[in-house]
Amino acid sequence: MALVPLASQGNFLHIYDFHVDPDHIDDFVKLFNEFDYSDGNPMHKSSAQVKDGVLCQDVKDPTRFWLIAEWSDIEEHARIRKILAEELRPAFIKHIRGGKFVPDYARIVSSTPQHLLDQAGDAKK
């Protein structure tokens, strides 16, 4: 399998960092997946989404989650996020402690060039 960078220099990551009600962790994940995999998720319809998001659970604190994805345009992400928050209001949000589901954004300033990853992959063979 070829090595690929997690994200590309010049793009952005959205990083949601939040806690879920400890009594509803499984419910949260189920509802998140139902919304995320549905045709009703406008994030997946945007050409500004470069790589689809991943939902990660903290191994030390099972109530803590991160949602991370790569986008080329953070204004476009913020515009769609506002639609989610104000119009669609997905059911999984009710299990987030404090109800805050707003990301921080990070600019990707370094990403290993593909030719170096290809060389590293060849060396593993």
List each model region and its residues.
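Short structured motifs
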Residues: 1-2, 51-54
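Eukaryotic N-terminal low-complexity, Ser/Thr- and Lys/Arg-rich leader segments
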Residues: 1-12, 108, 112-125
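Active-site-flanking beta-strand signature of metal-NTP-handling nucleotidyl enzymes
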Residues: 11-19, 66
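Short amphipathic
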Residues: 17, 107-108
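Short, surface-exposed ligand-recognition loops at beta-strand->loop->(often short) alpha-helix junctions
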Residues: 19-32
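Short coil/turn motifs at secondary-structure junctions
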Residues: 21-23, 72-74, 110
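An amphipathic, aromatic/His-enriched active-site/gating alpha helix that lines ligand/cofactor pockets
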Residues: 34-51, 60, 70-106
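A short, glycine/Asx- and small/polar-enriched loop/turn
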Residues: 61-65
